[in-house]
UniProtKB/Swiss-Prot annotation:
Family: Belongs to the major facilitator superfamily. CAR1 family.
Region annotation Disordered: where it falls in the sequence: 1-54
A GO cellular component annotation in the UniProt record: plasma membrane
Protein name: MFS-type transporter oryN
Location in the cell: Membrane
Xref: SUPFAM superfamilies: MFS general substrate transporter
Alphabetical UniProt keywords: Membrane, Transmembrane, Transmembrane helix
Membrane topology: Multi-pass membrane protein
Organism: Aspergillus oryzae (strain ATCC 42149 / RIB 40) (Yellow koji mold)
Stored Pfam families: MFS_1
Physiological role: MFS-type transporter; part of the gene cluster that mediates the biosynthesis of oryzines, natural products with an unusual maleidride backbone.
Amino acid sequence: MAVAELPNIVSTDSSPSPHPGSRLSSEPTDIESQKAPSNAEPKTDPNLVTWDGPDDPANPQNWSFAYRAFVTAIWVYGNLCTCIASSIFSSGSGQIAQRFHVGSTVVTLGISLFLLGYTVGPPVWGPLSERFGRKWPMVIGMALFTIFCIPVAVAKNLQTVLIGRFLTGVFGAAPLSLVGGSLVDMWNPAQRGVAMACCIGTIFGSPVLAPLMGNFIVESYLGWRFTQWLSCIMGGSCTVLVVFGLPETFAGSILRKKAAAIRKAGNPDVHTVYDGKQKGIKDIFVIFLLRPFALLVTEPILLLVTIYQAFIYGILYLVFVSYPIAFREVRGWSLGISALPYIGMMVGILIGCAIVVIQTRRNYDGNKAVVPEQRLPLMIAGGCLLPVGLFIFAWTSNPNIHWAGMVIGSAPVGTGMYMVFVQCLNYLVDVYPTIANSAIGANTFVRSFFGAGFPLFGPFMYHNLGVAWASSTLGFISIAMIPIPVLFYRYGARIRSWSKNSKHT
């Protein structure tokens, strides 16, 4: 939702919020505890540069609601561009296979390599954001994403296509990795719930929306190359919008700029609370590469929740090979018409988004502490909806049965996947507030490999088992996953008490 790094999307508490993404921010987990004090607060250091009182207009939290909504819309659009690019490639897989004389599985690598690029991006964009703020890493990421769409669009061989797809994934991870931190900068905890729900809905729904556009483009005279030009056009327009319309929201960057102006005016001793807190290479290696794997093998909550969420993410990208088989090969629909059933899943995702926002706002008033296990009832509900939808989809897939059954089944699949995915992220952030970057890093790494791997074996599974039994297999596995949130809802507090890394209260 890249789903990439995702944030604590609908949290209305004041606990640290790290990133979709995890797929969404790679900021330090103490981002809120490091909020700069204002000059209205007592301070002992006369050279400490802070906000000019609680109503300082330079503080993004004090911008008008309309302006913050505009800035949020830019971030949403950036994520829309890159997430559409992640899956619109699947629409042209048939033409690409014919053009380069390869099998469809080889072409599917274009999706898998894009998602693998998501695993490389966050360890780069997170530290850059901490050092240089949100805006310029976003500018660099979107500009390079746009540039590397071009070689894919004009490629003369498959190698160029695959390398270009990987690089667009690396640079396309920028908005996914940075958006969570920017929303934390602007919105208070209660407001942030809605803002982040919109972002995660975009990140989760855009890959489903992409084939609706891509299939009709490929079926027209424009062909598969225009799907990549479309990604390039969207990325370029977003780059221009970011350069000229996106303000810096990171308090550290704003206050450092203010301190630099004061130094230039004649006071060389001023500083900010953010000075000297940039992470070195060793810190980055430990936080993003070493500690995540250690946590996976020592933290049962992280391990099991990551497996569950990775399975959900894998199903999301498996859809882009299973739907063409179910509707084009089995039912004989045209390329464009075969994309319309994705609408059912989109509706389900929107329903899931609404449920999560409403229930979270009901549970958290912004003034009371979050109990991590309060996230789990929605995860359990989503986990129950998912196999129901998969079984409906599976056993109405016979071409002699009306197609409406499969579309209806797609809706609970979308709702269930969204609810499980979102609440998995929220639960991990609540359980591991002080090491959320590492926990989400481990989660993202495993999740991205599932997302990259499922489209590779999906065609073999659906061709060998048939649509009914292949989808039913996913349904049975989904049922087997339901005890995970049930276990933690019943015994989560006790399990957390065994860990030195988790929140115990």
